[in-house]
Amino acid sequence: LMRSSAASDVYKRQALVTVKPVADNSFFMQLDDSTTLLPVNMKNSPYGEKEVRALVNFDPVNESSGEYDKAVHINWIDSILTKPIAGDLGDKNDEVYGTDPVDMINDWVTIAEDGYLTLRFRTMWGNRSQAHFVNLLMSKDAENPYEVEFRHNAFGDVYGEPADGLVAFNLDSLPDTEGKTVKLKLKWKSFNGEKTAEFDYCTRKSVSYTHL
């Protein structure tokens, strides 16, 4: 599942970004660990003061980007379910967070960047009105602080047709890598048993802007 983001080129029109609100109710978008985008046709974030991961389609424009790297025109933007790492409930983990299987899809949106682990997963969906519950848990092994586990609770909706979901997890509760790149190990229960994958991970660099 280690993947370089296909969105790393600012001139690609569809990208995975972090929508970051700033002090004056405006926002910018973080394209990857080092590239920022200024949306010239949207002054206020559609997600208010929430920081979220999102899929965006944009065109670069030849306008001033101020303190940001590139000015862009947003054609459409769609947020991804964005969650913190879940709390450890001990003996209740299986009951609450579930043990239902998923397959992880190895594509350009499955990536660890900008302090998030974004995942495309596939599972069975029978009742489209039944919400599934997905979470990320930290390892209980103190010697493996960069090990996390994906959990899925289908609430009994385990038959039907395969379909994909997207989720992004904020990794800020993991230990600071202090500028180093480490291996982040993801564990999950697949339809073929327990599986793991590794991602290159570095704690998010501080990027703070107060105005556009």
What is each model feature region?
Residues L1-A7, Y11, Y209-H211:
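Single conserved hydrophobic/aromatic residue that forms the stacking wall/gate
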Residues R13-L212:
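First exposed extracellular module after export/assembly in secreted or surface-exposed proteins
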